[in-house]
Regions:
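Domain-scale recognition of functional cores that engage charged ligands
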Residues: 1-160
Length: 160
């Protein structure tokens, strides 16, 4: 859907203000839209530091994690960006939290991210007390998508 299109991401704070009439409680991750020439220039100059994602992509496919990429991979991605800048966004590489995770070798720390859920009714909007925590099961990986070998954990809020 439209909300899954990564090119919408920079506009989410404005959408919150428009639809909910309030300021966002959390800030967005800085996002450069490669379709904008000045932003593309910034991305090309900082490729080894950034995560670059296809705007229409899903599941962790078609992305570059600059700090983990080889020089060859970075140069290949540079050419892709120049050929189709409108198809990509870029973000800084985030330092994800870790949590103890049961893996083949035992319990070990793995990177995680949280997907909260919001329920909307005609008279109110409600944040679900919990969410889905996505886990990068490969040691050192920042890619939490299940299609790329990631896993999931239920997350519950036990006290407010």
């Amino acid at each position: 859907g439209v909300a899954d299109d990564k090119s919408i991401y920079p506009y989410v704070p404005d959408m919150i203000r428009f639809y909910l009439g309030e300021d966002p409680l959390l800030h967005n991750v800085p996002t450069w839209q490669c379709r904008k020439p000045k932003e593309l220039a910034h991305v090309l100059a900082h490729l080894p530091e950034l995560v670059v994602k296809e705007t229409q992509g899903s599941g962790g496919y078609g992305m570059l994690v600059g700090p983990a990429a080889s020089r060859e991979e970075i140069e290949l991605f540079r050419e892709r960006l120049k050929a189709r800048p409108e198809a990509y966004i870029a973000q800084p590489t985030l330092s994800l939290s870790t949590c103890p995770t049961f893996v083949e070798s035992g319990v070990a720390p793995r990177h995680i991210d949280l997907r909260p859920f919001v329920l909307s009714a005609p008279d109110r909007v409600r944040l679900v007390p919990g969410g889905l925590t996505r886990v990068a099961l490969r040691e050192g990986s920042l890619v939490v998508n299940s299609s790329q070998g990631g896993g999931t954990k239920d997350t519950w809020v036990v006290e407010e």
